[in-house]
């Protein structure tokens, strides 16, 4: 190490700052930089900065590609790890350079998370000498793991040369025939519960896998959530919730709101599968880049809030449209009215493009407040709906009839357990109480 590299351990600095700290001339500074092969220069004119590379396990540069909607992989950028720990310099295919204090915000959704992320973490931990608790992985651990993960990331990202080569040489997947779907799904669910990584790296806590299957509208890439066979009240409740999720998506679509296309399949032993078409896939090989509200707000909003609050702040920066803000208010209000207690920033996403970002179809919209808790306890009565003054009157008025229709449909569905149908019969009265509050709001 030298005095120059010691200074750069804390992060990028300009040439004038470095010369002043080292008390040297421009000529001496140029010679020092030329001798340090780990010192890199980026930026232009007065924005020029110097940084210190921080190779990780011998890797200094990580190439990234992105698959387009036709299935072609295009070079997106090179990522170089730098000091301080976790920082990186991203050089785009067009030569544009950007400094990030952590993972680039548009890649943060690739960090392993949820049910599949934990399976991935356990699988790679021993191989890479990492902790099997993915929450403790550092930024460079994540990037390195992404380069060796032999699977597919959501949104068509390819991190590392190996993944690029695998994509180029991959065979087209064979679809699961409709008449064999349940048999295949039962086996895939068993594999997933045993810790196998089946398909892409989708997040979320509900057990799931991804696959390529025949559907009534053609062959599709699908994300499949599932329950264990319904032998207990807990597994039965999870089955109720997956069926309710499909009902919610259908009602939103019928109401003119873009939501996932989904189908429920039930085996003879009451194992429930919710099959949803992946909205980051187009055709057989095409992919569409997506990014969560969580990732977007981490980059552009200093004080995150609810979906409507975050969307308004993004709209002020012209990152989303007023129409998207209004639609999100309706979605949020509908979620409140159907008792969705899990509307965190990872459950609303956008297609990644030049701003304004367009919303993806609504997903993970279900009455999660009725999910079994960690002790296996179940709610058996309707809860009070939380009123939110951050939602406009017009949004409430749009969402209320949709939510009433949702609960009425759940109450009539013979696939739903008697206990949950009873809750569904009670919920319209709770919504009427919200309707009274909305009536007192100004226009």
UniProtKB/Swiss-Prot annotation:
It comes from the Bacteria. GO terms for molecular function: DNA binding; protein serine/threonine kinase activity; toxin activity. GO terms for cellular component: cytosol. InterPro entries: HipA-like_C, HipA_Ser/Thr_kinase. Its EC number is 2.-.-.-. Coiled coil: none annotated. The active site is at residue 342. Keywords: DNA-binding, Kinase, Toxin, Transferase. PANTHER family: SERINE/THREONINE-PROTEIN KINASE TOXIN HIPA (PTHR37419), TOXIN YJJJ (PTHR37419:SF8). Belongs to the HipA Ser/Thr kinase family. Toxic when overexpressed in E.coli, leading to long filamentous cells. The toxic effect is neutralized by non-cognate antitoxin HipB. Does not seem to inhibit DNA, RNA or protein synthesis, and unlike paralogous toxin HipA its toxic activity is not counteracted by overexpression of GltX. Binds DNA. Might be a protein kinase. This is Toxin YjjJ. It comes from Escherichia coli (strain K12).
